[in-house]
Regions:
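P-loop NTPase motor core of the ASCE superfamily
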Residues: 89-90, 281-284, 410, 472-475, ...
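P-loop NTPase motor domains
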Residues: 25-26, 30, 34-35, 182-482, ...
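Basic- and hydrophobic-enriched, low-structure N-terminal and domain-boundary segments
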Residues: 1-20, 28-189, 193-197, 532-533, ...
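Structural motif
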Residues: 173, 449-450, 504
Length: 613
C-alpha cells in the first residue's frame, strides 16, 4: 500500500499541536471533574481552559485564580482541584498512548490469527511467558540453567496432583513437568561452566559423568559437604592409584535375571563404530553369551578376570576337555542352593546354544563379546572390579556403587576418564551408568513412587558416552524422579552418535539450550525450523517528484527469528533457550566463577568424609 509521507516540519507541527491539546484538555477535564465532585454543575468552556492553562504555572498554590470570572469563584479548593486534575491527566495520557499505538500499528502483513490456540506470529519470550521456569533463587529439585534478567531459569517441577475441577488460570497456564535438559555448544562456549553452576546449587543425590577434570575439580569439595562422594576412575586420571570406587558387573549377576540385566547394561554401552542394524544382532547374541558367563563367574566366586579369559579363549567343551565354564556349570548344578542349581540349568541352555552354532557364527559372537568385556583387560579397571575374598573363598560384598547407597543422602558418584580412554572403556563407564539407571527403574516399579528427592544425572560430552538406551532414558527418566542433563558439542554430534534415533532423543529433551558460536548446519537448520520466521515491516521511499515530497511504500517480509549469523555471533555467555511449548528465549549463562557464593563453593576443600570410596 502507499500513503503520502509527512515532512519533518509537518510532523513537528502535529506533535506540538497534539501536546497543546492534551494539556488544555487535562486542565479543562480536571476543573470540570473538581466541580462535579464538589456538587456544582460543570459548565466550563474549552476556550476558558485554554486561557487558564497559560496562567496556571504562575498560580500553582491558588489554581482558581488562573481562571477568569465567573469560573474562578465556582472552583473548589486547591487539594480537590489538583487531585481531580491529576486523575484527568492520567486518563488523557492513557487514551493518548492507546491512540498513538493504534495509529502506528502495522497496517500491512497477515491478519492476527491463533491456529491451535497459539499466536501465529513467532516472537521471543517475555518474562511472563517464562513464568513456569523463573525462580528467585536455588530451589530444591530444580536444576538452574541460566539467567533471564534478574531471575534464574530452572527446570520445572512436577505439577501438584490435585483432584477436582481445574481452575481457569490452571487451564491457561503453560506449566509442563520435569524433563530432560540438553546443552549444545562448541568447546569453550560455557556449557560445562553452566552445568557446574547448576551442580553447585543442587542439593539432592547426583551422578556426574565427565571426560574432563573441570566438573570434578570444581564441585567435588562442595558435594562432599552435603554427603558422601565416590569417584569411579579406574585409570587413576583424577584420583590416586587404587583410590577409585569399586564396581563390577558381577554385583547383580547372582541370579539369572540379574545376570541378564548386567549383560544388557554392558552391551547397551558397547561402541558400534557407525554400524547400524546388523550390529544389533551380534550384540544380542553376545548378550546371551555374557549373561551365562556372568552368572557362572558370580556363583563360582570368580571375578571379571575369569570372564575375560573365557571370552578371549572361547572357553567351551571340545576335544581337549569340557572346559572351565562347563565344569563350573556342572559344579553349580550340584549346589546346595536350589536357586543356584535352577539358574545353572537355565544359563546352560543359552551357553550351549552358542557353543553348538556353526564355527563362523560362534566366532563372530565371541568377537563381539570381546569388544564388550575388553575394558576389564585393563589392569586398573580389573582391579576396581575385583572384590577381595573373605574366609573359605566366599566373596565379600563391594563397598559399592548402587542406588540404595546413592539415595541414602545427598551422595555423589563421579564417573571420570580421560578423553583418550573414553571410547576404549565405554562398556565399563556406560555399564555402570546403565546399572544405576536400571536400578532406578526397578525401585520405582517396586514402590510405585518417583524418587524423592530427585536424582540428578549429568552426562558431559554425551557424544563420547554411547548409551543405546538414551532414547528411552530421555523420554522416561523424568517420570521416575530422575533429571537427565546431557551436554553436546553440536546437534551434528548427536546425529553422528545416534543416527535415526537422534530426533527421538532431541524431542524428548524438554529443555534445549544453544550456546554462542554454533555453526554446524544441523543446529542451524533445527533452530530455523523450530523458531520459524518473523514478519518484519519494510519501508521504501519514492522521491520522483521533488515538489510532492515523495511517497512511502510499506510492506512486510519474512525473516528467520534466529538467522544463522545471529546464532553464531551471539555474545559469549548468551544462549538460546527452547523449552517445551514456551516461546524461545534469549538467556545468559551463569559462570560460577563470577558469582561470589558459587565461587566460594567451587573452592571448598574435599572433606575427609567425602573421600571414602
Amino acid at each position: 500500500m502507499e500513503r503520502e509521507g509527512l515532512s519533518g516540519f509537518e510532523l513537528l507541527v502535529v506533535v506540538i499541536v497534539g501536546i497543546g491539546l492534551a494539556l488544555v484538555g487535562a486542565v479543562w477535564a480536571g476543573a470540570s471533574l473538581a466541580l462535579a465532585v464538589a456538587g456544582d454543575e460543570p459548565r466550563l468552556p474549552f476556550s476558558a481552559a485554554a486561557d487558564a492553562a497559560i496562567r496556571l504555572p504562575a498560580n500553582l498554590s491558588t489554581p482558581a485564580e488562573a481562571w477568569a470570572e465567573p469560573y474562578a469563584e465556582a472552583l473548589p479548593g486547591v487539594f480537590l482541584y489538583w487531585c481531580s486534575t491529576a486523575l484527568a491527566a492520567t486518563a488523557i495520557l492513557g487514551v493518548s498512548a492507546f491512540v498513538i499505538r493504534w495509529v502506528n500499528r502495522s497496517k500491512v502483513g497477515t491478519a492476527k490469527r491463533r491456529p491451535l490456540g497459539v499466536d501465529g506470529r513467532t516472537k521471543y519470550a517475555k518474562r511472563r511467558d517464562l513464568a513456569p521456569l523463573l525462580v528467585s533463587g536455588p530451589t530444591s529439585g530444580r536444576f538452574v540453567i541460566a539467567r533471564f534478567g534478574r531471575h534464574l531459569v530452572a527446570t520445572e517441577s512436577p505439577p501438584p496432583r490435585t483432584q477436582g475441577r481445574v481452575g481457569w488460570l490452571a487451564r491457561r497456564s503453560r506449566r509442563s513437568d520435569r524433563g530432560a535438559v540438553a546443552l549444545f555448544g562448541p568447546s569453550r562456549s560455557g556449557k560445562t561452566t553452566a552445568a557446574v553452576a547448576g551442580v553447585l546449587e543442587w542439593d539432592g543425590p547426583a551422578v556426574l559423568s565427565s571426560v574432563k577434570a573441570d566438573l570434578l575439580a570444581t564441585t567435588q569439595g562442595w558435594r562432599s559437604t552435603l554427603g558422601e562422594v565416590r569417584v569411579y576412575d579406574p585409570t587413576s586420571s583424577t584420583t590416586p592409584k587404587r583410590a577409585s570406587a569399586m564396581w563390577s558387573p558381577l554385583q547383580q549377576a547372582g541370579t539369572v535375571v540379574g545376570a541378564q540385566r548386567a549383560a544388557r547394561a554392558l552391551c547397551d554401552a558397547a561402541p558400534r563404530g557407525g554400524v547400524e542394524g546388523g550390529m544389533d544382532f551380534w550384540l544380542a547374541q553376545a548378550e546371551i553369551l555374557l549373561s551365562g558367563l556372568l552368572f557362572v563367574a558370580h556363583n563360582a566366586h570368580r571375578d571379571m578376570d575369569a570372564v575375560c579369559e573365557w571370552v578371549l579363549t572361547q572357553d567351551r567343551p571340545g576335544e581337549l576337555g569340557p572346559g572351565e565354564v562347563r565344569a563350573a556349570l556342572d559344579s553349580l548344578n550340584l549346589s546346595n542352593s536350589a536357586a543356584v542349581g535352577r539358574g545353572a540349568v537355565e544359563v546352560a541352555k543359552g551357553l550351549v546354544s552358542v557353543w553348538e552354532m556353526e564355527e563362523r557364527t560362534r566366532s563372530s559372537i565371541y568377537a563381539t563379546a570381546q569388544t564388550v568385556i575388553w575394558p576389564w583387560t585393563d589392569p586398573g579397571v580389573a582391579a576396581s572390579a575385583r572384590a577381595p575374598k573373605a574366609k573359605k573363598g566366599r566373596r565379600r560384598s563391594f563397598v559399592g556403587l548402587d542406588l540404595p547407597w546413592l539415595l541414602s543422602g545427598s551422595n555423589t558418584v563421579y564417573l571420570c576418564s580421560p578423553i583418550e580412554d573414553q571410547r576404549r572403556l565405554a562398556p565399563a563407564f556406560g555399564g555402570l551408568l546403565n546399572d544405576l539407571i536400571n536400578q532406578a527403574y526397578r525401585h520405582v516399579a517396586a514402590t510405585g513412587k518417583p524418587l524423592d528427592p530427585p536424582l540428578l544425572v549429568v552426562i558431559d560430552e554425551a557424544g563420547n558416552t554411547p548409551l543405546r538406551s538414551l532414547p528411552e532414558y530421555a523420554s522416561t527418566l523424568a517420570g521416575l524422579g530422575v533429571l537427565l542433563v546431557t551436554i553436546w558439542q553440536s546437534l551434528a554430534q548427536l546425529e553422528v552418535a545416534y543416527g535415526k534415533a537422534a530426533d527421538t532423543i532431541l524431542t524428548n529433551h524438554l529443555t534445549k539450550v544453544f550456546y554462542a558460536g554454533l555453526s554446524d548446519s544441523a543446529s542451524i537448520q533445527y533452530v530455523d525450523r523450530v523458531l520459524g520466521e518473523a514478519e518484519v515491516d519494510t519501508r521504501s521511499h519514492s522521491a520522483a517528484e521533488r515538489t510532492n515530497g515523495g511517497s512511502d511504500q510499506f510492506s512486510t517480509t519474512r525473516l528467520p527469528l534466529a538467522p544463522a549469523h545471529v546464532l553464531r555471533q551471539m555474545r559469549p555467555g548468551d544462549a538460546l533457550l527452547v523449552h517445551g511449548t514456551l516461546p524461545p528465549a534469549h538467556v545468559r549463562t551463569r559462570p560460577f566463577y563470577r558469582s561470589p557464593h558459587l565461587a566460594n563453593r567451587a573452592a571448598t576443600d574435599l572433606t575427609q568424609e567425602g573421600t571414602r570410596a
